[in-house]
Curated annotation (Swiss-Prot):
Organism of this sequence: Pyricularia oryzae (strain 70-15 / ATCC MYA-4617 / FGSC 8958) (Rice blast fungus)
Record-linked Pfam families: eIF3_N (PF09440), EIF3E_C (PF21357), PCI (PF01399)
Protein's GO biological process: formation of cytoplasmic translation initiation complex
The protein's name in its UniProt record: Eukaryotic translation initiation factor 3 subunit E
Biological function: Component of the eukaryotic translation initiation factor 3 (eIF-3) complex, which is involved in protein synthesis of a specialized repertoire of mRNAs and, together with other initiation factors, stimulates binding of mRNA and methionyl-tRNAi to the 40S ribosome. The eIF-3 complex specifically targets and initiates translation of a subset of mRNAs involved in cell proliferation.
Amino acid sequence: MAPSAESEDNSLAQFDLLPKLVKNLDRHLIFPLLDAASAQYYDEETNEPRDVDKAREMTKAKFELLKKTNMTDYVANLHCELEGTDEPPAEYAEKRQKVIKQLQDFEDSVSKLRDLLDREEVISNLRSDKVANLEFLKKEHDVTIEMVTALYDFGNFQYSCGNYPAAAELLYQFRVLSTDNDKVSAATWGKLASEILSGNWEGAMEELKKVREDIDSRLFNNPLAQLQHRTWLTHWALFPLFNDENSREALLEMFFSPNYINTIQTSCPWILRYLAVVVIAGRGRARNTGAYQKQLKDVVRIVKQEGYEYSDPVTDFVRALYIDFDFEEAQRQLPRAEEVLRTDFFLMSIGDSFVDAARHLFFESYCKIHARIDLKRLSEQLGLNVDEGEKWIVNLIRDTRLDAKIDFQEGTVVMNHPNSSVYQQVIERTKGGFFRTQVLSAAVAR
């Protein structure tokens, strides 16, 4: 008996990465993930819950997540939704007034210093030496350490209120002046989160680079702390990775660097899902074919190494296609991978690109070991009906200039594999060995 849709949904639920992701994100970064997860329990047209219990569970989770922040109006609305009331308790109005007063107090405490930092004649006298800058501001403008620290405190307060652009600006101003390395490091993480939540991807990438450098230098003598901080950064970097195409290559370079590959394998192997998807989906956009092939080989290598530690339909598709060469299993896993992508916050928008690219890779691998391919069977394996399959394969052969032709009368694709004699293969391998020997000899001669 075929499995029901409900049992299939339940089996795929085990691949939900939300519980793993939230452990490595700030509460404000968790919120978009929770919000997206809760949307699946509501009707898109009526906005009425389709699953009342699940919808309430997600609302409760959002309330618990944000109740300690200063986002008082939103938290009050969540309370009303949970309790089924129109008016929140008086404590929320009291907290709102308290937050407004604190905002005004912070404004007053930093107004003098922020005004100074807006003046050209002051900025022109600042140098890269923070100690000298503080001495100049203290001597010429009566600026104190407490006033600088107030920028940091106000930035944190604005962040707690959900005013992310304001928080980013305050934390930047603090970082320009402060000599407190621990707070400067915390401010950089805070500014990174603020830029992510503001959707300022260029700014986020600048901060991500600073955080990465800080981890490498400041925590050099503490490998355990380095591993923990790199684990956090790996998760935070998923936001620009899937939201800013211009940042993708730089981030992939980071992910595939030895330090971060080691971090993923040691601490968070589930990140393999995101690496596999972004690499495969980038097949058509890759400017450098060599770099793309290397990234794909790296993904395959890590999937093979980490199979005992982590697997899901995405990594199982990669394993079936490139490690086991099991095309039936790859065919089975691709639609499952597509379903997993549709419920993953970071991968929802890239699902179609992934499936299309995965079909291309499936076709390429399949064609390498078959001389004549049945169109109907291949269409089924690609998850397409016969007409869609024929059209898709015709377009692929045309676009990639694949040396193949379609025999519509027989319903087959005929591959033109060039014959390569054993003699020719020996010559090619000997050439490669001779070249490597020359390189080694030259290296030894130096």
